[in-house]
Amino acid sequence: MKEKILLIWKHLKQGTLKKMWKQTLWIYQYGRRYWKAMILYTLLGLVGTGVSLVSSLISRDLVDIITGHQTGKLVSTFAAMIGFSVANILVSQASGYASTFINLKVDSEIKNDIFAKMLVTDWESLTDYHTGDLVTRWSSDASNISSGILNWIPNLIIYTFRFISALAIVLYYDPTFALFALLGIPFSALLSKPLLKRMRDNNQRSAAMNAKLYGFNQEAFSNIQTIKAFDLIHFYTEKLKSLQKDYVNMKLDFQKMSILTSVLMSIIGFIVSYSCYGWGIYRVWSNAISYGTMTMFLSLSGTLTSSVNSLVSLIPSAISLTISAGRLMDIVEMPQEDYSQDSAVRNFEKQHKSEGIGLNMQDLSYTYHNGTAVFANASIEAYPHEIVALVGPSGEGKTTMLRLILSLLTPQEGSSHICAGADHEHMIDMSPSTRKLFSYVPQGNTMFSGTIAENMRNVKQDATDEEIIEALKLACAWDFVEKLPDGIESIVKERGGGFSEGQAQRLSIARALLRRSPILLLDEATSALDVTTERKVLRNIMQDTYPRTCIVTTHRPTVLNICNRVYAIRDKKCEILNDVEIHEMIQTF
């Protein structure tokens, strides 16, 4: 038997308990930042408890004065009763305000911290999670942590103090009454035990289901045009109903057990209350206590019962906290990007910005986490005042190469450097820190809600109107922006609403040009433009006096003859095409 118990305990330590302990330590790292707030909240709670207990004693005296069991000044006792009642209200409201104020502050600080950590998490690892799941973890789980940090330990101290102080008063006047008041504790403990595992499982499933529902709604609202175009309204409505049905069934399944437990707890509460009431009547009848003392006992009996229930309720609260901590730890403990070269990159840019900055990547090999090999010994180079094109069928690795250039992905083999102009003597390793040297225009619509000017200034806060207009001209966007009634102050709706795809692409390119980064990456960023406009945009970039390096990915070979070099991505390599091959591509397009 002893060996079996030890085996079970070992299993618990290696499993749930070990995991919960690790999650608790993670919460503690945040909790110790706010120890002053926790002390303030605890002190307010203790003062409130003290005022409440003194009010019970004064209430006893007041009843005894009225019933004639005690002589005293009725008016002064009544005034004291009112005074402590008002004090209790003031302390309660002050505690509530302080709790709300501190909780909001802590919540925003923790969310900011989690948000910052999410943004520097390894990109490929982060893509394993749906964006709806990430938002749910950041919002709901982070709020749960902030609330728990402020409330859990202070409430443990407050409820324990309330229980012990009330119990001490009851024991002082009538130890037997304390037995009746504490009668429900063993039953509460026994009934709460089967709920704990179910509660943890339910909380985990509930969090996962909430994330799934949020992700579904987010995707549906983001793709309303597609849903309407394919006449999928009924399909998506039924799919939402199915998800909601699963969620409701999960909640009701747990609620059935909760109701049964609640009914049993209520019955036990009635038994305890009426036992205390009966014992109080008997003691009054036998002249052992006064009416005032019985009134105080009944009040303190409720305090004892509520304190025990409050302490028991901290257990599911702790479980919920550890689950939220675990969900956040899944994200923030993923590999983090290294930004230790920020200072070196800034200095490098400052020294060589006038001559321009290029890149040189040699013998790269890269395989995704899922085992898909994309590159093997691939090489690419691009220098200031050059336009370098990457061509190839979809899925061959054009976008992956741009991710390698941006250090969103790290090659398993090979070397990648940023260089001063075309000088291979002055180079710096590519890393997340070198992203500040790039302007990136990805596939699709990347405009934000707001005005055109606000979109432009997202990348350069101090940009003047003249600089914005100049960037719009380079991207061939000023022609249509100039004709708008509000010009650069015209409103851009969500996802570039109000503008055609071609116009939105030109605005995105203008925003990237405004940043005046040494290297410009265009990932199919001209796909919605007609050939003439596409060539004009690229020529403008090439003829600009700013020493910019430009790398474009494209499916259309019609602009390749204005590029300095063209790399064909095939067979996991980047091969430079000669003029004959480029001409053949243009002819067969």
Placement of each model-derived feature along the sequence:
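Membrane-integrated ABC transporters
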Residues: 1-51, 67-77, 95-99, 103, ...
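Juxtamembrane loop-to-helix connectors within ABC transporter transmembrane domains
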Residues: 31, 99-103, 119-164
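An intracellular "coupling" helix at the cytosolic face of ABC transporter transmembrane type-1 domains
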Residues: 36, 123-124, 140-149, 153, ...
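Transmembrane helix-loop-helix hairpins at lipid-water interfaces of multipass membrane proteins
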Residues: 38-94, 98, 172-176, 287-291, ...
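A hydrophobic transmembrane-helix motif
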Residues: 51-60, 153-196, 249-298
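Cytosolic ends of transmembrane helices, especially the final helix of ABC transmembrane type-1 domains
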Residues: 232, 256, 304-334
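ABC-family ATPase nucleotide-binding domain "signature/switch" substructure
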Residues: 400, 439, 444, 455, ...
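Conserved post-Walker A segment of ABC ATPase nucleotide-binding domains
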Residues: 403-473, 536, 540-547
